[in-house]
Amino acid sequence: MKTFSPKPQDITRDWYVVDAEDKILGRLAAQIAHRLRGKHKPEFAPHVDNGDFIVVVNCEKIAVTGKKLSDKKYYRYSGYVGGLREQTLANVLATKPERALINAVKGMLPRNRLGRAMLKKLKVYAGSEHPHQAQNPQALELKY
């Protein structure tokens, strides 16, 4: 029996909506990355992008444990001397709450062309409204 290798025309992608209210940031990101890669499907192959589309709403109400709000820092470097900028998680959640979840999921995906394609299937919104009603996303209850 030959090993099954999924073809691009055989891939079916579903749309799911996840409510991030009172969910822990890292645990939520791990489960989203698992679904974006397609590891929950029996036809998973590491060289094929066969994951689903994930729409995350209420990202501004995400939870973190411990002292991460003040201790966790995000760094950006402009490339110029003195251009290293740092923000705490509290500042990121106050200004752009979507970025905290996107950065967490991005760190759990492969760092190559395939990982960038997987990240494009993640749609994150701070409020409870999203513009993807036409795709009929199913509500997805994650484990924790």
UniProtKB/Swiss-Prot annotation:
Coiled-coil segments on the chain, per record: none
Record Pfam families: Ribosomal_L13
UniProt keyword annotation of Transcription regulation present: no
Key words, A-Z: Ribonucleoprotein, Ribosomal protein
UniProt key word 4Fe-4S: no
One function term, GO molecular function aspect: structural constituent of ribosome
The protein's assembly and partners: Part of the 50S ribosomal subunit.
Name of the protein in question: Large ribosomal subunit protein uL13
